[in-house]
């Protein structure tokens, strides 16, 4: 614990593990199973409970509550965890819950993520790296969020939804279906409004890759053939385009929800349905 500073008003329970150069601010409460890695900073009134791991050099602001029991009536009080990666910024009032013993039992957040004020990550979610939750963005239980996703302020995501990497959800949207990689969704209920072009450019995709994705998505939601045939056509036509295959593979994996589609498309479509 070399270089670690704990304010005299903070409560760090016996058993908690603190790394080096950790700062624990006034009135924080750290539970006995918490693990705080090197270089983390907790401002004032932060609560970290349960088997929660906070990755190195992460910063948590006032009144954030991490690792409390899941809001899941099926949870029976069993051993579950919350794991947060390194270099994460967790702003005021953010809440993240541990997994539930009726499911995978783990809530996982990747590295280099930003959670703005009052964002919420529910039980059994899996959030990738370099993800941004704007103010009041909320995801329900069992949601999967890919790398480099941005969720706009005041937006909510239904339980079991999958969000592909580099996707973008506009502010004050309600996403109830799976969103393809690179997709942009807006509205209540959110519809696919095109591709996240800015995100693709930031990811280093070349112009030809962006054009291929645009054409592939147009083919997928053309509605002239059964959806399964469209998926197979795109897979064959763009067999050498990794970015397109990312979208195809995401669709073929098929989660528990339907897909977020354009406004004119059937918003309950699944790959195994005509």
UniProtKB/Swiss-Prot annotation:
GO MF, any single term: acyl-[acyl-carrier-protein]-UDP-N-acetylglucosamine O-acyltransferase activity
Tell me the Gene3D superfamilies matching this sequence: Hexapeptide repeat proteins, Udp N-acetylglucosamine O-acyltransferase, C-terminal domain
Q: Name one Pfam family in it.
A: Acetyltransf_11
Protein family (similarity comment) = Belongs to the transferase hexapeptide repeat family. LpxA subfamily.
Q: Which UniProt keywords apply?
A: Acyltransferase, Cytoplasm, Lipid A biosynthesis, Lipid biosynthesis, Lipid metabolism, Repeat, Transferase
Task: Enumerate the InterPro entries for this protein.
Answer: Acetyltransf_C, Acetyltransf_C_sf, Hexapep, Lipid_A_LpxA, Trimer_LpxA-like_sf
Q: Which domain of life is it from?
A: Bacteria
Q: Which organism is it from?
A: Bartonella quintana (strain Toulouse)
Could you tell me the EC number(s) of this protein?
A: 2.3.1.129
- The protein's role, per its UniProt record: Involved in the biosynthesis of lipid A, a phosphorylated glycolipid that anchors the lipopolysaccharide to the outer membrane of the cell.
Q: What is its main location?
A: cytoplasm
Which GO CC terms are listed, alphabetically? Answer: cytoplasm; membrane
Q: Which pathway is recorded for this entry?
A: Glycolipid biosynthesis; lipid IV(A) biosynthesis; lipid IV(A) from (3R)-3-hydroxytetradecanoyl-[acyl-carrier-protein] and UDP-N-acetyl-alpha-D-glucosamine: step 1/6
Q: How does it assemble?
A: Homotrimer.
The alphabetized list of GO BP terms reads:
lipid A biosynthetic process
Q: Report which reactions are catalysed by this protein.
A: a (3R)-hydroxyacyl-[ACP] + UDP-N-acetyl-alpha-D-glucosamine = a UDP-3-O-[(3R)-3-hydroxyacyl]-N-acetyl-alpha-D-glucosamine + holo-[ACP]
The record's listing under HAMAP family reads:
LpxA
Compartment(s): Cytoplasm
Q: What is this protein called?
A: Acyl-[acyl-carrier-protein]--UDP-N-acetylglucosamine O-acyltransferase
């Amino acid at each position: 614990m070399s270089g670690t500073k704990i304010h005299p008003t903070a409560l760090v329970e016996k058993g908690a593990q603190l790394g080096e150069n950790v700062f624990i601010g006034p009135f924080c409460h750290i539970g006995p199973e918490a693990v705080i890695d090197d270089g983390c900073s907790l401002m004032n009134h932060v609560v970290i409970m349960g088997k929660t791991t906070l990755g190195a050099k992460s910063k948590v602001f006032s009144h954030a509550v991490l690792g409390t029991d899941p809001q899941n009536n099926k949870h029976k009080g069993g051993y579950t965890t919350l794991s947060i990666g390194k270099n994460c910024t967790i702003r005021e009032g953010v809440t993240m819950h541990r997994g539930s013993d009726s499911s995978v039992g783990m809530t996982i957040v990747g590295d280099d993520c930003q959670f703005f004020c009052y964002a919420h990550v529910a039980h059994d979610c899996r959030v990738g790296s370099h993800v941004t939750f704007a103010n009041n963005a909320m995801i329900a239980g069992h949601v999967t969020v890919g790398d480099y996703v941005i969720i706009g302020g005041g937006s909510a995501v239904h339980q079991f939804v999958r969000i592909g990497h580099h996707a973008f959800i506009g502010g004050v949207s309600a996403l109830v279906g799976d969103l393809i990689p690179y997709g942009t969704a807006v509205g209540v209920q959110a519809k696919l409004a095109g591709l996240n072009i800015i995100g693709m450019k930031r990811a280093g995709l070349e112009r030809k890759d962006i054009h291929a994705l645009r054409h592939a998505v147009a083919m997928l939601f053309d509605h002239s053939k059964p959806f399964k045939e469209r998926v197979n056509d795109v897979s064959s036509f763009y067999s050498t385009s990794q970015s397109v295959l990312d979208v195809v593979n995401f669709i073929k994996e098929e989660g528990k929800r339907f897909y977020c589609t354009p406004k004119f498309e059937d918003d309950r479509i699944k790959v195994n349905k005509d």
